[in-house]
A protein has these predicted regions:
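Extracytoplasmic
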Residues: 26-51, 59, 260-265
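Extracytoplasmic gate region of multi-pass secondary transporters
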Residues: 46-47, 241-284
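Central cavity-lining transmembrane alpha-helices of secondary-active solute carriers
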Residues: 69-82, 284-296
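C-terminal ends and interior cores of transmembrane alpha-helices
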Residues: 101-113
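Hydrophobic core of transmembrane alpha-helices in multi-pass small-molecule transporters
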Residues: 117-132
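Intracellular juxtamembrane helix-capping segments at the cytosolic ends
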Residues: 132-145
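Helix-loop-helix hairpin linking two adjacent transmembrane segments in secondary transporters
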Residues: 160-206
Length: 309
């Protein structure tokens, strides 16, 4: 029997399960903003910096791509410590520290004049991006959502993809003025936009007097949800084949994505002969397909008729 609930009513129920906007969705919006900042200013603009740094200092692509590779190593090694820090101090503090490092790193980048200083600055930026980015944000989202967790994660990731669409703006700034000016402005944007935004992040729904997904549950149901999360530890996870298969698949995917991020724009400028802005426009097409993928994810995780009722 078809549901009598309209799509608009379903959306309203999703975002306002108790007559007001569930605070978890504000956290998702903030996460999307932070992902946007990290994506447009650094992760997806790194190829632009390799081009301008190669032109100014004649550093080889091997040296420049090596710096990016070290950031990925740093991210992997920092992961376990980062998880402990978030559990110990909460995501808001860790995000703030990370964004401060991220912003300062860009201000230092605008003054770099040697390969050693560049590598040290990239290290500061990469630690800042890790602490003030995806993994820390996901801790809050996972705590705030259960039934709608997939949708919440997908919506938060929209920020990163939208950041990729805006990479041509960064390229235009580098061509119109100078990459050092762009780096300095980027540092200011991170501090002025990112740090105030993450002050609204909360670790768990209880801190705002709310419940998971914004749905009022009976006491025994709340206990069941908490026990389900607490009973499956990281030690249990590493014993399952699924953990290692997902990790391997994710690692292979990131290898491909990282290669495109670092080498696509340099290839289009040096190999094909395009201008920096033209190359970035072609690069931004990657983000369009990312958005399509996220859209499919949201489509296939839409509420079932049973959930809407």
């Amino acid at each position: 029997m078809p549901s009598s609930v309209s799509p608009i009513q379903s959306i309203d129920k999703l975002f306002r399960p108790n007559g007001k906007v569930f605070y978890g969705w504000w956290i998702v919006a903030i996460a999307a903003l932070i992902q946007f900042i990290g994506g447009v200013l650094w992760m997806q603009s790194y190829g632009l910096y390799t081009v301008v740094l190669h032109e100014e200092f004649s550093w080889s692509m091997t040296v420049l791509s090596g710096a990016f590779a070290l950031t990925r190593v740093e991210s992997g090694l920092l992961g376990p410590l980062q998880g402990w820090l978030v559990d110990r101090y909460g995501p808001r503090i860790i995000l703030t520290v990370g964004l401060v490092m991220f912003g300062i790193g860009f201000l230092l980048l605008s003054q770099t004049d040697s390969l050693l200083s560049y590598y040290l600055i990239v290290f500061v930026i990469s630690v800042g991006v890790s602490l003030g980015g995806f993994h820390t944000l996901m801790v809050s989202i996972v705590n705030w959502f259960q039934k709608h967790r997939t949708k919440a994660v997908a919506w938060s990731q929209m920020g990163y993809s939208l950041g990729g669409l805006c990479v041509p703006v960064v390229a235009w700034g580098m061509e119109w003025d100078d990459w050092r000016t762009v780096a300095m402005i980027s540092g200011g944007m991170i501090v002025l936009l990112g740090i105030p935004a993450v002050q609204w992040i909360r670790h768990r729904p209880e801190e705002k007097g709310e419940q998971v997904d914004g749905i009022v549950q009976k006491e025994e149901e709340q206990t069941k949800v908490k026990d389900a999360g607490a009973s499956f530890t990281w030690r249990d996870a590493v014993r399952t084949p699924a953990f290692w298969l997902i990790s391997a698949g994710h690692g292979i995917a990131l290898l491909s994505v990282s290669s495109v991020i670092v080498h696509m724009v340099p290839h289009l400028t040096k190999g094909v002969g395009l201008g920096l802005t033209e190359a970035s426009l072609i690069f931004s097409l990657v983000s369009i397909f990312q958005l399509i993928g996220l859209g499919i994810c949201l489509l296939y995780t839409s509420p079932s008729p049973r959930d809407r009722g």
